[in-house]
Swiss-Prot record:
InterPro entries tied to this protein: Exonuc_VII_L (IPR003753), Exonuc_VII_lsu_C (IPR020579), OB-fold_nuc-bd_dom (IPR025824)
Similarity annotation: Belongs to the XseA family.
Domain of life per record: Bacteria
UniProt organism field: Yersinia pseudotuberculosis serotype O:1b (strain IP 31758)
UniProt enzyme class: hydrolase
PANTHER family named among the record's database cross-references: EXODEOXYRIBONUCLEASE 7 LARGE SUBUNIT
Annotated disulfide bonds: none
One annotated Gene Ontology cellular component of this protein: exodeoxyribonuclease VII complex
UniProt entry keywords in alphabetical sequence: Cytoplasm, Exonuclease, Hydrolase, Nuclease
Record text on subunit structure and interactions: Heterooligomer composed of large and small subunits.
Name this protein carries in UniProt: Exodeoxyribonuclease 7 large subunit
């Protein structure tokens, strides 16, 4: 039996140890969902049980310092979500799991996915307050992204009709539950941004279970909300329901009805304010006219006390002029205020950001095209230099020399064999050929005469 064959023979204990090390190193920790059976808890406080599905099972242990953190008592037949390490019990050769944590499956698994995505997006800055857009005050047109047949749409329209009937509403119907719902919600948000006909969007649905609301915990929906140029109010479920969309949105409303309250004006309150302002204006005008009438009365009385008709006529003429000037001044002030209002409206229309956003998008696309071209040219240059270097390396490779029929022989000390003085009879040599190594033993060393080489006999 050769030396290499002897080194590959395992004992049972060595085999089990090697398999255990491979399992622990290669597999590490995993998440597993399964049904519990054969659950037991001896006096040590450790838990021993079997995890199974309809086709296979595996033994599992959960030590006391880990199971004391579990918030429920596992029962046979219960579906659980387990985080465990794979190992092998060497004395028996049984492979098993060592559980680190356990929680009920179903909502527990969804909650785990929710927390992982929440931490990821928070680390990327999608929840930062600096990215939040303010809502328009007041909104000129509202978009609603929800199911066309759901109660949420009915609630939103009912509140808007009650508070501000003149506010236009555009509905972007979409599924809010099921496998296709996240992609439909994303497309609705993108369509609303492309059409740019609304200055605020309500994205949401009515209440439901965690699975029902799961479309609003989808990463694609979260990124679509973050990338929206139109401010978005999230309105998912009830006040106690929290989704990823709530964290990314510019504003979170506890319910769809509350979202409608946030984006609309209370028209009844506005009417009351206008009526109050009108009443105060009328009172001010009455007071102003009363003061002027009193002034006219005093002047008239003074004129009557002086009696000269000519002076009275002059004073009457002056009063008429003052009255006309007063009326003209009032008309002038009204015209100036009207012109100022028109100029402010024109300035407001000129600062709409759509054109500037379009130009920025074009510049970004141009920069992206030039960057891709530059990277492609640089990569082509790298590929050419790499190919040349590989060709040069293959030309000087020792393996190429071996492929032509040559070999390399090493002494027992590992040095290259160049002369007969390096070896003696009985030494073992290692010879490298093109496709492997050959070990040989020297039986005789013959020194060549003159230019003749040593003869090595094996």
């Amino acid at each position: 039996m050769s030396q290499s064959s002897a080194s590959s023979i395992f004992t049972v204990s060595r085999l089990n140890q090697t398999v255990r090390e491979l399992l622990e190193r290669e597999m590490g920790q995993i998440w597993l969902t399964a049904e519990i059976s054969n659950f037991s808890q001896p006096a040590s406080g450790h838990w021993y049980f079997t995890l199974k599905d309809d086709r296979a099972q595996v033994r599992c242990a959960m030590f006391r310092n880990s199971n004391r953190r579990t918030t429920f008592r596992p029962q046979n037949g219960q579906q659980v979500l387990v985080r465990a390490s794979i190992t092998l019990y060497e004395p028996r050769g049984d492979y098993q799991l060592i559980a680190e944590s356990m929680q009920p499956a179903g909502d527990g698994l969804l909650q785990q996915q929710f927390e992982q995505l929440k931490q990821q997006l928070a680390a990327e800055g999608l929840f930062d307050q600096s990215h939040k857009q303010p809502l328009p005050r007041p909104a000129k047109q509202v978009g609603v992204i929800t199911s066309a047949s759901g109660a949420a749409l009915h609630d939103v329209l009912h509140v808007l009709q009650r508070r501000d009937p003149s506010l236009p509403v555009i509905i972007y119907p979409t599924s809010v539950q099921g496998v296709d719902a996240p992609l439909q919600i994303v497309r609705a948000i993108q369509l609303a941004n492309l059409r740019a006909e609304c200055d605020v969007l309500i994205v949401g649905r009515g209440g439901g279970s965690l699975e029902d609301l799961w479309s609003f915990n989808d990463e694609r929906v979260a990124r679509a909300i973050f990338n929206s140029h139109i401010p978005i109010v999230s309105a998912v479920g009830h006040e106690t329901d929290v989704t990823i969309a709530d964290f990314v949105a510019d504003l979170r409303a506890p319910t769809p009805s509350a979202a409608a309250e946030l984006v609309s004006r209370n028209q009844i309150e506005l009417v009351r304010q206008i009526q109050g302002q009108q009443q105060r204006m009328e009172m001010a005008m009455d007071y102003y006219l009363a003061q002027r009438n009193q002034q006219f009365t005093r002047l008239e009385h003074r004129l009557q006390q002086q009696h000269p008709h000519l002076r009275l006529a002059r004073q009457q003429t002056l009063l008429l002029k003052l009255q006309r000037r007063l009326e003209e001044s009032a008309q002038t002030q009204i015209r100036l205020l009207s012109k100022r209002t028109e100029r402010l409206q024109q300035r407001l229309q000129q600062v709409q950001p759509q054109g500037q956003i379009h130009r920025y998008n074009q510049r970004v696309q141009q920069q992206e095209y030039r960057l891709r071209q530059a990277v492609e040219r640089q990569l082509n240059g790298y590929r050419q230099r790499f190919g040349i270097a590989c060709s040069q390396l293959e030309a000087v490779s020792p393996l190429a020399t071996l492929a032509r029929g040559y070999s390399v022989t090493q002494t027992p000390a590992g040095a290259l064999l160049k002369t007969t003085k390096q070896v003696q009879a009985g030494d073992k040599l290692t010879t490298r050929l093109q496709d492997g190594w050959v070990e040989s033993e020297i039986t005789q060393v013959t020194v060549a005469k003159k230019s003749r080489q040593k003869k090595v006999v094996t």
